[in-house]
Amino acid sequence: MTAKVRIAVVGASGRMGRTLIESAKQQQVIILGAAIERTGSSLIGIDAGVLAGVGAMNVAITDSLDKVVNDFDVLIDFTSPESSIIHLDWCAKNHKAIVIGTTGFNHAQKEQINAYSEQVPVVLAPNMSVGVNVMWKLLALATEVMGDYTDIEIIEAHHRHKKDAPSGTALKMGEIIAQTLGRDLEQCAVFGREGITGERDPNTIGFATVRAGDIVGEHTAMFADIGERLEITHKASSRMTFANGAMRAAFWLSDQNAGLYDMQQVLGLN
């Protein structure tokens, strides 16, 4: 497929929204077709490119997907779990593909996403960075070799504004490790430790969370044994890596049938 794909960005004025708009302007196969903000926003009518600091793109910010239904092919959503479900419902009714980078979905919301994906193409990924997705492959390999005799801990750090913890990326890391070991993450995860906790259970996967400053995103999986320790780490220095991944996902998704996909499939890693 060589035709350009038109995207829409919801939450256009947010940190990620502005980065997505900036990324879209840099792409050869992506066109920004629409940018959406909440009803009543003072930004309605402003050029999306001007808002993002990249110059005019001739796309005025609007407050309704209905107003721009014919202006895009794929919606990109990095908002909140509740908003993402609303946008997904709209996409299903209007036959639009959607790329979801939102994290923090509960079990019921994940079930809703599964159901909607029977109607439209959906990419759901807790992290759209190419590097993170390669890291997940490395985690599976390390777990196969070392997972049954090492203590496994996952440490993640993000900026002070992040609302969910642990991050979706950290949880995905835990899921990959647990699945490789034949365990259920819900049964073996330990989220933080305090007080007299006793000796470490060797079958657990520990999680530690940091929220501070403007950290874009850092994730480390530690495989610790007596005498040596392997650490697999990814550090993001800019949100642009997530935005560029979302553009890649949108282009790929525009040519897919209804279904639920992830970045491993987008990148051909699975």
Curated annotation (Swiss-Prot):
Q: Where does NAD(+) bind?
A: G11, A12, S13, G14, R15, M16, E37, G101, T102, T103, A125, P126, N127, M128
Write out the function statement from the record: Catalyzes the conversion of 4-hydroxy-tetrahydrodipicolinate (HTPA) to tetrahydrodipicolinate.
Q: Does the keyword Cytoplasm apply?
A: yes
Give the encoding gene's name. dapB
Q: In which pathway does it act?
A: Amino-acid biosynthesis; L-lysine biosynthesis via DAP pathway; (S)-tetrahydrodipicolinate from L-aspartate: step 4/4
What's one GO-annotated cellular component?
Answer: cytosol
The similarity annotation says: Belongs to the DapB family.
EC top class, as a word: oxidoreductase
Where along the chain is NADP(+) bound? R38
Protein name, UniProt field: 4-hydroxy-tetrahydrodipicolinate reductase
Q: Where does (S)-2,3,4,5-tetrahydrodipicolinate bind?
A: H159, G168, T169
Substrates-to-products reaction catalysed: (S)-2,3,4,5-tetrahydrodipicolinate + NAD(+) + H2O = (2S,4S)-4-hydroxy-2,3,4,5-tetrahydrodipicolinate + NADH + H(+); (S)-2,3,4,5-tetrahydrodipicolinate + NADP(+) + H2O = (2S,4S)-4-hydroxy-2,3,4,5-tetrahydrodipicolinate + NADPH + H(+)
Keywords from the named record: Amino-acid biosynthesis, Cytoplasm, Diaminopimelate biosynthesis, Lysine biosynthesis, NAD, NADP, Oxidoreductase
Tell me which species this is from. Shewanella frigidimarina (strain NCIMB 400)
A Gene Ontology molecular function term for this protein is: NADP binding
EC numbers? 1.17.1.8
Q: Name the residues annotated as catalytic in the UniProt entry.
A: H158 (proton donor/acceptor), K162 (proton donor)
Q: Which GO BP terms, alphabetically?
A: diaminopimelate biosynthetic process; lysine biosynthetic process via diaminopimelate
Which NCBIfam families does this UniProt record tie to the protein? Answer: dapB
| Taxonomy, superkingdom | Bacteria
Using the UniProt record, give the first listed, main subcellular location.
Answer: cytoplasm
Compartment(s): Cytoplasm
